[in-house]
Structure formats: C-alpha cells, structure tokens
Amino acid sequence: MDLSFMAAQLPMMGGAFMDSPNEDFSTEYSLFNSSANVHAAANGQGQPEDPPRSSNDAVLLWIAIIATLGNIVVVGVVYAFTF
C-alpha cells in the first residue's frame, strides 16, 4: 500500500505542539506576551505562600511506610509456609 495514500486517510492534527499554519494564536492567549508578565510570574507576585506543613503529614507517611513493609513481610511468610 502506498504511504502517501495512508497519510491521506489520517485526519489533520493540529494544536499547540504542532507547527500548524491553520490556527491563529493571538498574543492575548500567549503565556509570554509581555516582559512584565514574565517578571511577575518569576517573582511570584500576588500568589499566597503555602502554609508550613504540619508534622501530621510526616506521621501519616511513616505509618504508610511501616504498613507497606508489614504487608511485604506477611506475603513473604505466607509464601514461605505455602511452598
């Protein structure tokens, strides 16, 4: 089968990651339409900072790690006594 015939059967793909002349990308939707926006984004102006994480997250992480290791040990013991 001819490759040009197969390519003709595929739909034309376009988007932000394709070099498509069919789409009109105006500067209104551009991420970097002015240097002021770039500097504001780099400085992080107008965005609240995240509150410091509590130790509760660390405790839950350690519980999950210990539970995972416990499950691995249980599976190993069951496997050892099965065979």
Curated annotation (Swiss-Prot):
Keyword set, alphabetical order: Membrane, Transmembrane, Transmembrane helix
GO cellular component: a single term: membrane
Record flagged with keyword Membrane: yes
UniProt keyword Membrane, yes or no: yes
Transmembrane segments: 58-78
Subcellular location per the Swiss-Prot or TrEMBL entry: Membrane
Record membrane topology: Single-pass membrane protein
Main location: membrane
Top-rank taxon: Eukaryota
Protein name: Uncharacterized protein C14orf132
